[in-house]
C-alpha cells in the first residue's frame, strides 16, 4: 500500500490552526464562562506558586490567639497589662488549623517581615469560636447556625478588626510594601479608620471589595460591627425557616456582605474620590462617623483572581 506524505507546510498550517482554535476557545471561556470554569482554567495555566522572595532580618513575633484574647480581655476589664502588643499593630491570618500548607509559608513570612515591629497571630476554627464566645457571646448562637466553617471564618475577620485592629490578610497573599505609616497617621487623628481594597473583578461589582485584605488603625471601628450584624441577621432569619437555601459564603459573610455593609454604613465610600489622579484611595465624606478608606485596585488588588493577565502574573514572579 502506498501512503501519501503530507507536506511539511501543511503540517505547520494544521499546527497553527490548532493553536489558534484552542487559544480562542480558552479566551472565550475566560471571558464568558462561569466563575468555576474560569477559576479552573486560571489554576491550570497559572498554578499557585510560593513567593520566590527570600526574607531575611527580623520577623514580627508570633503570639497564639488565646494569649491575645486574654490580654485584650484584661484591658477591656480595666486590669493592668504589661505587654509589647500595640492595638492596631497586629497581623491577623487564619486557617482551619495551625498547620498552614508549606506552599504558603514564604507568603506568611512576607507579612511578618514587612511588619516586623508588629505582632503576628494565626487564627484557626477553634480560636474563632472562642473569640465569639468570649467577646461577642450574644452572637454565638447565630455563629454556630452558619452553614459551614468558611462562613464562620469570613465572619470572624470582621471581629479581628473590631476587637484588635491591625491588618487581616489571606495566607495566599504577599506583602510587597508596608502600609504601617498610613495606619499610624490615621490612628493619630483619634477616631479609628478602616481600610479596604477595591478590585476590578469581571464577575460583578458586588464582588469588587474582597475581604482578603482588611485593616483598622485601632480597635472599635463601627463598620466591622455593621458587617458582622449583616451576617447575624441572615443567620437568625434562616433559623426560622431551614428550607431557605444558603447562598455562597461571599453573600452571607464575605465580599458581597462587606460591600452591602459599606453601603449601609456610608455609601460615599464607593463614590467620593479624594484628590487627583495621583491619589489611590477613596474615603468617607461624613466627618461625624469613623472614616473608611478604600484603596484603588492597583494598591491592594492589581489583578483579579478570575481573569488572569500573563504580563501581570509574570511580573509578580520576577
Features from the language model and the residues they span:
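Small-residue hinge/turn detector
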Residues: 154-166
Amino acid at each position: 500500500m502506498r501512503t501519501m506524505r503530507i507536506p511539511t507546510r501543511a503540517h505547520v498550517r494544521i499546527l497553527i490552526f490548532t493553536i489558534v482554535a484552542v487559544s480562542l476557545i480558552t479566551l472565550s471561556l475566560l471571558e464568558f464562562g462561569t466563575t468555576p470554569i474560569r477559576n479552573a482554567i486560571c489554576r491550570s495555566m497559572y498554578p499557585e506558586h510560593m513567593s520566590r522572595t527570600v526574607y531575611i532580618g527580623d520577623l514580627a513575633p508570633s503570639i497564639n490567639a488565646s494569649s491575645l484574647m486574654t490580654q485584650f480581655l484584661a484591658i477591656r476589664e480595666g486590669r493592668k497589662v504589661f505587654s509589647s502588643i500595640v492595638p492596631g499593630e497586629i497581623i491577623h491570618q487564619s486557617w482551619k488549623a495551625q498547620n498552614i500548607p508549606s506552599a504558603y509559608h514564604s507568603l506568611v513570612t512576607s507579612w511578618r517581615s514587612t511588619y516586623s515591629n508588629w505582632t503576628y497571630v494565626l487564627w484557626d476554627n477553634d480560636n474563632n469560636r472562642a473569640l465569639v464566645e468570649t467577646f461577642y457571646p450574644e452572637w454565638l448562637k447565630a455563629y454556630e447556625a452558619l452553614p459551614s466553617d468558611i462562613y464562620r471564618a469570613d465572619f470572624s475577620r470582621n471581629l479581628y478588626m473590631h476587637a484588635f485592629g491591625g491588618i487581616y490578610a489571606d495566607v495566599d497573599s504577599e506583602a510587597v510594601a508596608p502600609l504601617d505609616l498610613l495606619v499610624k497617621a490615621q490612628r493619630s487623628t483619634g477616631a479609628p479608620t478602616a481600610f479596604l481594597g477595591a478590585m476590578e473583578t469581571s464577575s460583578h461589582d458586588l464582588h469588587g471589595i474582597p475581604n482578603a485584605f482588611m485593616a483598622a488603625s485601632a480597635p472599635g471601628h463601627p463598620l466591622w460591627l455593621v458587617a458582622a450584624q449583616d451576617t447575624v441577621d441572615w443567620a437568625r432569619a434562616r433559623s426560622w425557616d431551614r428550607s431557605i437555601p444558603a447562598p455562597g459564603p461571599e453573600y452571607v459573610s464575605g465580599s458581597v456582605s462587606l460591600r452591602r455593609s459599606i453601603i449601609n454604613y456610608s455609601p460615599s465610600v464607593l463614590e467620593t474620590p479624594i484628590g487627583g489622579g495621583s491619589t489611590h484611595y477613596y474615603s468617607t465624606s461624613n466627618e461625624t462617623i469613623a472614616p473608611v478608606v478604600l484603596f484603588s485596585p492597583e494598591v491592594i488588588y492589581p489583578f483579579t483572581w478570575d481573569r488572569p493577565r500573563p504580563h501581570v502574573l509574570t511580573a509578580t514572579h520576577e
